[in-house]
Amino acid sequence: MSRVGKLPVAIPNGVTVTVTPDNVVTVKGPKGELVKAMSNKINIAVEDNSVVVTRDNDHKDVRALHGLTRALINNMVTGVNEGYIKTLELIGVGYRAQLQGKKLVLSLGFSHPVEMEAVSGVEFEVEGGTKVKVKGIDKELVGAVAADIRKWRKPEPYKGKGIKYENEVIRRKEGKTGKK
């Protein structure tokens, strides 16, 4: 048995989980609704305030799907109940972020500002011009949007300039030591 897959997913109050016969899982909660199609090789059942994920056989691919399916359902339940937040920090002279409506405008030292439209299901929040929070109920989407923002200026190892995640540690390098 998968260590992750054998654990049931607890359903908190205010959250409803429904599973169709073709393994489409719908999770509704106070923050919204998520729908995801899961593999037909896995059995998903809702039993008294928990979701139980089981498998029919022990083939390698089915064992891998077992833990994955349970983790995806857990992420959906957490998302509609609490939501997800990824915080990015802009480090560098003149690196700024601001909101224009639902659009995020980044000044990153290019000759032009970088504009990013908010994808449906994701919203931006800017704190002090150098912190950007990406919020949403879909963990995968929040992480993808945060990675898209970070990719514009990845942190460089010499001065640490760039866009980094809040708790990310940048491995620093020593510069050249000049002739003596």
Curated annotation (Swiss-Prot):
List, alphabetically, the GO terms of the cellular component aspect. Answer: cytosolic large ribosomal subunit
Gene Ontology process terms (BP): cytoplasmic translation
Which InterPro entries does the record match to this protein? Ribosomal_uL6-like, Ribosomal_uL6-like_a/b-dom_sf, Ribosomal_uL6_a/b-dom, Ribosomal_uL6_bac-type, Ribosomal_uL6_CS
Q: Which controlled-vocabulary keywords does the entry list? A: Ribonucleoprotein, Ribosomal protein, RNA-binding, rRNA-binding
Q: How does this polypeptide assemble, per the annotation?
A: Part of the 50S ribosomal subunit.
For this protein, the record's PANTHER family field holds: 60S/50S RIBOSOMAL PROTEIN L6/L9 (PTHR11655), LARGE RIBOSOMAL SUBUNIT PROTEIN UL6M (PTHR11655:SF14)
Q: What does this protein do?
A: This protein binds to the 23S rRNA, and is important in its secondary structure. It is located near the subunit interface in the base of the L7/L12 stalk, and near the tRNA binding site of the peptidyltransferase center.
Question: HAMAP family from the xrefs?
Answer: Ribosomal_uL6_B
Please give the name of this protein: Large ribosomal subunit protein uL6
Q: Which organism is it from?
A: Clostridium botulinum (strain 657 / Type Ba4)
Q: What is the lineage of its organism?
A: Bacteria, Bacillati, Bacillota, Clostridia, Eubacteriales
